[in-house]
């Protein structure tokens, strides 16, 4: 008989700790978007440095 109140208390404590699937999906989408943005910024930086170097070699850039 004592197990029932303990079980109910454990259920009440565990239910708010369960992750919300929508919240987890939003967090993973935000992380993925941030990684894609960082990757695009890196590619833009690499391309701009290559173009700048080529421009200096050819004499197009000041």
Swiss-Prot record:
Q: Name one GO molecular function term.
A: toxin activity
- Does the record carry NAD as a key word? no
Q: Kindly state the tissue distribution recorded for this protein.
A: Expressed by the venom duct.
Q: Which residues form the signal peptide?
A: 1-19
Q: What else is known?
A: The mature peptide does not contain cysteine residue.
Q: What species is given as this protein's source?
A: Conus tessulatus
The reply on keyword tRNA-binding is no
User: One Pfam family of this protein, by short name?
Assistant: Chi-conotoxin
Q: Which family does it belong to?
A: Belongs to the conotoxin T superfamily.
Name-wise, this protein is Conotoxin TsMLCL-02
- Compartments, record wording: Secreted
Propeptide cleavage-removed residue intervals: 20-54
User: Main localization of the protein?
Assistant: secreted
InterPro entries per UniProt: T-conotoxin
Question: Which key words are in the record?
Answer: Neurotoxin, Secreted, Signal, Toxin
Cite the source lineage: Eukaryota, Metazoa, Spiralia, Lophotrochozoa, Mollusca
Q: Which GO terms describe its cellular component?
A: extracellular region
């Amino acid at each position: 008989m004592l197990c029932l109140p303990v079980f109910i208390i454990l259920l009440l404590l565990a239910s708010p700790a369960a992750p919300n699937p929508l919240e987890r999906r939003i967090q993973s989408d935000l992380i993925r978007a941030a990684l894609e943005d960082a990757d695009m910024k890196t590619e833009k930086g690499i391309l701009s440095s290559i173009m700048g170097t080529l421009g200096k070699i050819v004499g197009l850039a000041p």
